């Protein structure tokens, strides 16, 4: 699905760092290190990144659009 703008639990804006997270993740950096550097410290916000499906640079939304 499309990455959410805000954390579902606390309401912090998390979408502003998603592009940086996605870029650095494709460069084979550790998700823990990336989130620490980006200042995402709350567990609920970190969960939003960890649970978002991202394989080979493609999101779930990209797969769904193919069958439209």
UniProtKB/Swiss-Prot annotation:
<feature type="binding site">
    <location>
        <position position="44"/>
    </location>
    <ligand>
        <name>Zn(2+)</name>
    </ligand>
</feature>
<dbReference type="InterPro" id="IPR020789">
    <property type="entry name" value="RNA_pol_suN_Zn-BS"/>
</dbReference>
<comment type="function">
    <text>DNA-dependent RNA polymerase (RNAP) catalyzes the transcription of DNA into RNA using the four ribonucleoside triphosphates as substrates.</text>
</comment>
<dbReference type="GO" id="GO:0006351">
    <property type="term" value="P:DNA-templated transcription"/>
</dbReference>
<keyword id="KW-0804">Transcription</keyword>
<dbReference type="GO" id="GO:0005737">
    <property type="term" value="C:cytoplasm"/>
</dbReference>
<keyword id="KW-0548">Nucleotidyltransferase</keyword>
<comment type="subunit">
    <text>Part of the RNA polymerase complex.</text>
</comment>
<keyword id="KW-0240">DNA-directed RNA polymerase</keyword>
<dbReference type="InterPro" id="IPR023580">
    <property type="entry name" value="RNA_pol_su_RPB10"/>
</dbReference>
<feature type="binding site">
    <location>
        <position position="45"/>
    </location>
    <ligand>
        <name>Zn(2+)</name>
    </ligand>
</feature>
<protein>
    <recommendedName>
        <fullName>DNA-directed RNA polymerase subunit Rpo10</fullName>
        <ecNumber>2.7.7.6</ecNumber>
    </recommendedName>
</protein>
<keyword id="KW-0862">Zinc</keyword>
<dbReference type="GO" id="GO:0003677">
    <property type="term" value="F:DNA binding"/>
</dbReference>
<dbReference type="InterPro" id="IPR000268">
    <property type="entry name" value="RPABC5/Rpb10"/>
</dbReference>
<keyword id="KW-0808">Transferase</keyword>
<keyword id="KW-0479">Metal-binding</keyword>
<dbReference type="GO" id="GO:0003899">
    <property type="term" value="F:DNA-directed RNA polymerase activity"/>
</dbReference>
<dbReference type="GO" id="GO:0008270">
    <property type="term" value="F:zinc ion binding"/>
</dbReference>
<feature type="binding site">
    <location>
        <position position="7"/>
    </location>
    <ligand>
        <name>Zn(2+)</name>
    </ligand>
</feature>
<dbReference type="Pfam" id="PF01194">
    <property type="entry name" value="RNA_pol_N"/>
</dbReference>
<dbReference type="GO" id="GO:0000428">
    <property type="term" value="C:DNA-directed RNA polymerase complex"/>
</dbReference>
<comment type="similarity">
    <text>Belongs to the archaeal Rpo10/eukaryotic RPB10 RNA polymerase subunit family.</text>
</comment>
<feature type="binding site">
    <location>
        <position position="10"/>
    </location>
    <ligand>
        <name>Zn(2+)</name>
    </ligand>
</feature>
<keyword id="KW-0963">Cytoplasm</keyword>
